[in-house]
């Protein structure tokens, strides 16, 4: 008999680039990715984006979408609630990995709050209702994500990594949007097109991994042994020298997806 169909085990949203993810039971998929995913980004005053690669403490910031805005939490600091209605919306040129585009300023309270977290002056930018960032590569508008609208990893691939590594790794270290179950390890590497719920996805390319994966889950510390990159380098290195784990997806239509669906 046919093996069981893979399932969508979980969905994860990252409202602010580089901050903590939050689980969703269902999500609306748009051209730009999950609705509400990476719509905000922390930048230096000149618009240069900052991430947990240099500021690992960002991963302890929890951003929760609330009616008309965002609720921010960080250990040892008062919560901050942001309302889109209060945003200055002053345009600012920014960029992500060579793409230059305009985003909108949020508000001074957000800048001050996040500057305390970052330990240096920063600003919080918002994409607005639609992204001003068009990527030729994907043929779509993209959020503040590194390059593709969505990322998928299977539980089996993480289990395989954990069998090979001395450290135990969490899926949260890989900042994936979609987690698949019921597959063989790295089965997703061979997928070309998949359907989840109402949405068909193009499996665009494998995701190359960086130092950010080595921030230990739930902390602001990098792993001293550079895990999981050290282990992944031994068996997931491409011909280009990059280390690959997970698959980048592009949605071919808009629609709803739900955790637990095939």
Language-model segments: which ranges?
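Metal-cofactor-dependent catalytic cores
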Residues: 1-262
